[in-house]
Amino acid sequence: MTSAQICIMIAIIVYLIGMIYIGFRCSKKNNSTDDFYLGGRKLGPFVTAMSAEASDMSSWLLMGLPGVAYLTGISDAGWTAIGLAVGTYINWLIVAKRIRRYTHTCNNSITIPSFFSNRYRDEKKMLQVIAAIFIVIFFIPYTASGFAACGKLFSSLFGVNYLTAMIISAIVIVAYTTLGGFLAASTTDFIQSIIMSVALIVVLIFGVETAGGIGAVIHNASKLPGYLSMTLSYDVNTGKAAPYSALTIVSTAAWGLGYFGMPHILLRFMAIEDEKKLKLSRRVATIWVVISLFVAVFIGVIGYTMSKVGALEMLTGSNSETIIVKISALLSQHGVIFALLAGVILAGILASTMSTSDSQLLAASSAVSSDILGAFRKDSSNKNGSMAAARITLLVISVVAAFIARNPNSSVFAIVSFAWAGFGAAFGPVVLFSLFWKRTNKWGALAGMVCGGSMVFIWKYLIRPLGGIWNIYELLPAFLIACVAIVIVSLLTPKPSKKIEEEFDRVAQMK
């Protein structure tokens, strides 16, 4: 092992030990499942903002997004980033405060499925169980992609066996999440967002300098047809510019719709201690997201120029997702300090993965232990039993995710894209209508959830392959169909009870 690799290893080990320590400290504050899954609703504004965005921006921020920009230019990555930035702001603006109030009013709901059940007085728990099933369906492979990303990182850096690296990474994530629950996940996510920011800044500065300056970056990138255009895309196969139609732009920007249905992000809104500070959280979150997304896309362009001038090898296919890893390896060759900085960058990649994986594990765990098992558990007063069930469920889900992640060849961006569409379509419309349309009833919510979730599969595997006008991101049509289903079914079935309507009015009138 070289001195540079040793420095990188030291930085990463210090980071990992810190995460486990936080989990241990937070474990002492968990006295109930409310604490374990929602931190007792005690998050401050900065932790709420940064943990929400860190859990949102998974490894694709430092791997997938720069990789797409490196290969095809700024159009695909750019419109995705714009959709996400707009979606982030709107989610904080219209959903955050209302869902914080409503979940607290609705029998102190601590999960999204339990909120649906309490919101519509669903005594048979149909909404709760079906929502929980969708969470497990989409989150287990999503978590597996995070484990796989960690394994790939260590394997490529140190030449260790992929499976060994993946399992060790999974153990660390599971350790602090199982110990500390939501509070540990949120605290570590806050720290991880800072590390991710440092990683982006260092790579940006070093990359521009190595590429020969901003002018050289723009000059080299502009030589590729359509590479720097928002209405064209560079086609790797033909070497020519390909049209980026208005339909494709709308389809790509539709990523922003996914935010309304992301359980691990919505939980942060539910957990803030003082709803009056959500405005501050919104500003912090939006600024961080806009800057991070812009820098991530630009790093992809910088990486191409670095390859063009011979500083890096030319990357093809999924290897383009390792562009920041390659830049870090180059940085580490400039001495001990730079090697430690490279370690921080790589810890940032690790952080981007871990910050999402821990939140996903908690959401999937709560879906099984609290929403599925809890729906059939008669005695809910046994706090120790509930906590034990929560931790055991988290461990079982982690083992399943690790089993799926044993294959190192899966695409991080593709898995994230599909899971994002699944949650956005299954839950997004139901969340919005539950919060803002009084006439919505449980049958409409159920129809929207089932239609949205199932249409993601139907569109992706049966309709989208037809090409042409059908080749759009599955989230957009599935989201719209779910909205239509909610309205039609709600209007065709009895309206909500007077008690439900009065509760809706009470929440809506809160100042």
Model feature map: region roles:
Residues M1-K511:
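Membrane-embedded helix-loop-helix hairpins and adjacent transmembrane boundary segments
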